[in-house]
UniProtKB/Swiss-Prot annotation:
Membrane spanning residue stretches: none
Positions of region (Disordered): 32-58
Name of the encoding gene: rpsU
Organism: Clostridium botulinum (strain Hall / ATCC 3502 / NCTC 13319 / Type A)
Family affiliation: Belongs to the bacterial ribosomal protein bS21 family.
Name of this protein: Small ribosomal subunit protein bS21
GO molecular-function terms, A-Z: structural constituent of ribosome
Ranges of compositional bias, category Basic and acidic residues: 32-42
Annotated GO biological process: translation
Cellular component, GO, one term: ribosome
Segments of skewed composition (Basic residues): 43-58
InterPro entries: Ribosomal_bS21, Ribosomal_bS21_CS, Ribosomal_bS21_sf
UniProtKB keywords: Ribonucleoprotein, Ribosomal protein
Amino acid sequence: MSEIKVGENESLENALRRFKKKCARAGVLSEVRKREHYEKPSVKKKKKSEAARKRKFK
C-alpha cells in the first residue's frame, strides 16, 4: 500500500496529488482493473501471447 506523510504546511490537494502519483507509479490501479473479474488461466495465456505478437510486429 502506498503511503505519504503530509507536512504541517502542506495542503490536502498537494498531498492527494502526491498520493495519486505514487499509486500510479506503483501500478495499483492497473492491478485493480486486472483483478476486477476472474480470468481463466487459458484466457490469460491467450492475452499474453496476443500482446507478445503485437509487440513483435510493431
